[in-house]
């Protein structure tokens, strides 16, 4: 949908974003703010949509919003979002404890890359339904309290965290929450046949050509507002000489966009 200025939505623009998120758990907007490097775009947009609890991860900027661009000092420490490498399917904050679950996030594109940097997105509710309809035991396995463990991060003192064990699917105030990563390193799945089968089936959904997967490449001034949907990012190539070095603002929240 078109918006005049994400920092100052009209009532009808805000209502439409909420409405679409209520249907699909995600909404994509376009604005005239191509190339405008102002993190208030993400901050004010979130506030107007009722997102009040910004969650700053250790690598976020001082104001709690992350500037996702190729950053050597962060990429050297192994943090893929700050490289031009592909990001595998995941939900944000899958390594967080339950009290810090990421309910929503905003991505706002200041500048695209010269090539690449596409996102694919899938509503977790659709993923749940596909798994349930294929075999209810898949959902049962992924809802177990010990379905997935993210080992402790003890290598980087600035982003140290303990191991986190929990379900893939959980409910929070009547809404579905999903924590997932397609990474095969730094993750431990519950060692039983049901969990392995469920993870394999979900992997096939994400690797296939599902009509439920939405694909887009954000242009300058465009953005995504969503209730922490599954997403990935393809590798990309920057060309600073032509001004095409990818910069995306990311704001994460522990609350969700609700259809008021």
Predicted feature residues:
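Active-site environment of non-heme Fe oxygenases that use a 2-His-1-carboxylate facial triad
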Residues: 1-8, 20, 61-217, 223, ...
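N-terminal auxiliary "cap/dimerization" subdomain that precedes the catalytic jelly-roll/cupin core
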Residues: 1-55, 60-61, 218, 223
